[in-house]
């Protein structure tokens, strides 16, 4: 990837990410108990977007992708693992207010710490060679599986919502939720794909690392 094109894409994405991140965190909502779950979901979404903004900022201002490939891969793997958890939690809790529990939160945090630690060990302690490549492949598979599992939970939650609305509400509401479910399929596939393409080194990274 050309550095100029890469920087332009980051420059275009950063303002949008920052705007929506702060908007989700700080915008006013009706002060009613019924909106509490919605507010928590929006705040989690805002935190996830600001976390991605911080990641993009490091790439944009310091060009870490072209200076230290291992550090860039580690930062992206760790960031996307955590963002998968945050985005999925924000979406699911809109449909299932009991989804967020202390046990689930601690499980995701512990998994994130283990994943990030193992990524650092593989990238900085293992010598370059077949073992490092196999280990990186295993971590990539872990990230893919984690993303797919979370995506499946989101899709199941939306399908459950469709059934509930079909049984209790008007047809137009059920159709809307069904459309939202289809949109969610594509959003999740796009998000997981972008995450993988971001941390996997391209030809520029490989040549930089070899130099």
Label each residue range with its predicted role.
Residues 32-54, 108-109, 133-210:
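Alpha-helical transmembrane segments of multi-pass integral membrane proteins
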Residues 121-126, 159-161:
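Membrane-helix interface motif
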Residues 67, 126-134:
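Membrane-interface helix caps and helix-loop-helix hairpins in membrane proteins
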Residues 93-96, 123, 195-202:
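Hydrophobic alpha-helical transmembrane segments
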Residues 1-121, 138:
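N-terminal low-complexity or simple alpha-helical regulatory segments
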């Amino acid at each position: 990837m050309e550095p100029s094109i890469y920087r332009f894409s980051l420059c275009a994405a950063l303002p949008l990410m920052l705007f929506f991140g702060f908007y989700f965190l700080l915008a006013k909502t009706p002060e009613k108990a019924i909106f509490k779950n919605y507010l928590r979901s929006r705040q989690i979404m805002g935190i996830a977007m600001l976390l991605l903004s911080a990641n993009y900022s490091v790439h944009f201002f310091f060009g870490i992708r072209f200076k230290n490939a291992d550090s860039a891969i580690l930062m992206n793997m760790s960031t996307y693992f955590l963002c998968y958890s945050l985005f999925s939690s924000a979406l699911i809790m809109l449909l299932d207010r009991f989804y967020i529990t202390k046990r689930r939160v601690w499980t995701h945090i512990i998994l994130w710490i283990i994943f990030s630690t193992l990524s650092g060990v593989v990238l900085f302690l293992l010598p370059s060679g077949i073992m490092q490549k196999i280990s990186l492949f295993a971590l990539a598979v872990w990230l893919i599986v984690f993303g797919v599992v979370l995506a499946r939970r989101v899709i199941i939650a939306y399908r459950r919502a469709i059934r509930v609305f079909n049984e209790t509400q008007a047809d137009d509401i059920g159709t809307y939720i069904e459309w939202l479910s289809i949109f969610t399929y594509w959003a999740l596939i796009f998000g997981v794909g972008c995450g993988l393409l971001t941390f996997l080194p391209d030809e520029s990274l490989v040549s930089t690392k070899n130099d």
